[in-house]
Design a protein with these regions (language model features):
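P-loop NTP-binding module
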Residues: 2-46, 57-79, 83-293
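Helix-loop-beta junctions that constitute the ligand-sensing/allosteric loops
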Residues: 47-51
């Protein structure tokens, strides 16, 4: 083995937090050992940081460097060249965008107003009155920004009628929530999301003929109790609140909800009506989102 290269990188099968940036770049295939050697020589010659020297030699792009730095500091996001997931996962693909910053602001509000007020407060249902308001978009990206904070995060797709999280994340095959509620699976139906540390997804699973009845079973409450023992945050996607009572059932079990509206689309009267029904059911409304994405 090349002993000069050995002084630059210590090869490991997978990049892990705490590795030197050069080690991560080689382990992820962004740099070869030979190129890493060239960068190290240029780094010493110019007195630059390793990443800046690599960019100067045109061996890396700024995007490559940012992705490696995110792994070094345990801040997971996805390479834009990875098209296996939906571009709607803005917090994963564009973590430094204004939209992602707004999602982090929402995260802070939810932590201050709910999650940090009581150790038992783990779950938040994402609700809206109508279809197309962006519930699934907000739920998915909110789960991502919680996971980027180092919180063990579970995203549950409780929209058993028109689920979207499976299409957004394209995870490994899972029995899904419907199988859990039918008693055929358990928390193992939550699968890891590759590339995004600290995040697991429980997709909706097969569409049942009786979604409202399934969600109303004690099994859903038991699932959230089991999940609360393993996760710091549980984000739950729901169907449109004015079309079905499913969202209210989910929010009652979660005990907290965030209301999503879309600019120039959502009807204020419908959103206000849903908010009243939730509050009358004992649900704490923690945060509201005007979705302009």
């Amino acid at each position: 083995m090349n002993t000069v290269a050995d002084n630059i990188v210590s090869l490991r099968p997978d990049p892990v937090a705490g590795q030197a940036i050069g080690e991560i770049l080689v382990a992820t295939g962004r740099l070869s050992l030979r190129d890493a050697q060239r960068v190290a020589a240029e780094q010493r010659r110019q007195g630059q940081k390793f990443g800046e020297a690599a960019i100067g030699l045109k061996l890396l792009t700024r995007e490559d460097l940012d992705l490696a730095l995110s792994r070094q500091f345990e801040y997971s996001y996805l390479n834009v060249r990875d098209t296996s997931r939906s571009a709607e996962l803005i917090a994963a693909y564009q973590p430094f965008s204004q939209v992602a910053e707004s999602l982090r602001a929402l995260r802070s509000q939810l932590m201050l107003r709910w999650l940090q007020t009581n150790p038992a407060h783990k779950a938040i249902a994402i609700v809206s009155a109508g279809s197309g308001d962006g519930r699934s978009f907000i739920a998915a990206n909110l789960a991502i920004v919680f996971s980027q904070l180092g919180q063990q995060t579970l995203l549950i797709d409780a929209d058993l009628r028109d689920p979207r999280q499976q299409a957004l994340f394209m995870p490994e095959k899972s029995a899904g929530l419907s199988a859990v509620l039918a008693g055929r699976s358990g928390l193992e139906a939550a699968v890891a999301v590759s590339g995004l540390a600290n995040l697991r997804l429980m997709p909706a699973g097969a569409s049942p003929p009786n979604p409202q009845e399934l969600l109303g079973r004690p099994a859903f409450s038991a699932l959230l109790q089991d999940a609360a023992a393993e996760f710091d945050v549980i984000v739950i996607d729901t169907p449109a609140g004015c079309d079905y009572a499913d969202a209210e059932i989910v929010a009652r079990v979660a005990r907290a909800a965030t209301l999503v509206t879309r600019k120039n689309q959502s009807l204020l009267s419908e959103a206000a009506s849903l908010a009243r029904r939730l509050q009358d059911s004992g649900v704490t409304l923690v945060g509201a989102v005007l979705n302009d994405a």
